């Protein structure tokens, strides 16, 4: 199963993540305690042996162009209401792999109805990968009854409040294509190797 460990800030964190995950991410041009500068991001991209996603909440094409040019990454993770026209321009101009985030409510009175609404939204986009998240790096789980329904229709990456203790049961129930974690594998505001190791072992132990 695809495992992305997001929000790295240093070469030391990158080295840990490379040992366990399939991809990582750097937080850029948005309000986040994990945000780093573009020059730092470029250094991590150049050092990395795995894909490094540039993660941002911006919907401005000029900001995305700046990110691409100054970090050298070909992987973008978009947490905004960016339109398909802008996505098409970026893909055609730069050939980037684009993962688009779709917000799932924390709780739902009608999971089937909410899932259908989100599926309808997803179907208006043409992107390389779909991310289901609770919010913009809030570290909270969402109503997995919704993501379970969506995962039957699309190969989704599941995010939001995942940690070593809950990820086995969540993955077993939702059956995503992959998972994305950040705060759930941190201790003292840094990526923790033991937590990352446990997280990845628990993900890989799920029999789907």
Swiss-Prot record:
InterPro entries given in the database record: Aldolase_TIM, PRAI_dom, RibuloseP-bd_barrel, TrpF_fam
Enzyme Commission number(s) from the entry: 5.3.1.24
GO molecular function: phosphoribosylanthranilate isomerase activity
Catalytic activity annotation: N-(5-phospho-beta-D-ribosyl)anthranilate = 1-(2-carboxyphenylamino)-1-deoxy-D-ribulose 5-phosphate
BP term (GO), one: L-tryptophan biosynthetic process
Keyword terms of this UniProt record: Amino-acid biosynthesis, Aromatic amino acid biosynthesis, Isomerase, Tryptophan biosynthesis
Gene3D superfamilies noted in UniProt: Aldolase class I
Signal peptide span: none
Pathway: Amino-acid biosynthesis; L-tryptophan biosynthesis; L-tryptophan from chorismate: step 3/5
Domain of life: Archaea
Any one Pfam family match given in the protein's UniProt record, by short name: PRAI
Entries under CDD domains matching the protein: PRAI (cd00405)
NCBIfam families listed in its UniProt record: PRK01222.2-4
Family recorded in the similarity comment: Belongs to the TrpF family.
Protein name: N-(5'-phosphoribosyl)anthranilate isomerase
């Amino acid at each position: 199963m695809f495992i992305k460990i997001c929000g790295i800030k240093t070469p030391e964190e990158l080295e840990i993540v490379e040992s366990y995950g399939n991809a990582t991410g750097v937080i850029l041009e948005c309000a986040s305690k994990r945000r780093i500068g573009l020059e730092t991001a470029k250094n991590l991209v150049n050092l990395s042996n795995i894909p490094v996603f540039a993660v941002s909440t911006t919907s401005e094409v000029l900001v995305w162009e700046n990110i691409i040019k100054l970090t050298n990454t070909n992987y973008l993770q978009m947490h905004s209401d960016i339109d398909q026209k802008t996505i098409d321009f970026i893909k055609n101009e730069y050939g980037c792999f684009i993962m688009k985030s779709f917000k799932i409510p924390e709780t739902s009175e009608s999971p089937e109805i909410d899932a259908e609404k989100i599926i309808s939204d997803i179907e208006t986009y043409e992107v390389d990968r779909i991310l289901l998240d609770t919010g913009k790096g809030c570290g909270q789980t969402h109503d997995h009854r919704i993501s379970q329904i969506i995962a039957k229709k699309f190969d989704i990456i599941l995010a939001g409040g995942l940690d070593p203790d809950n990820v086995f049961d969540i993955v077993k129930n939702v059956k995503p294509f992959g998972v994305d974690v950040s705060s759930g594998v941190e201790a003292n505001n840094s990526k923790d190797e033991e937590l990352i190791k446990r997280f990845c072992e628990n993900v890989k132990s799920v029999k789907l």
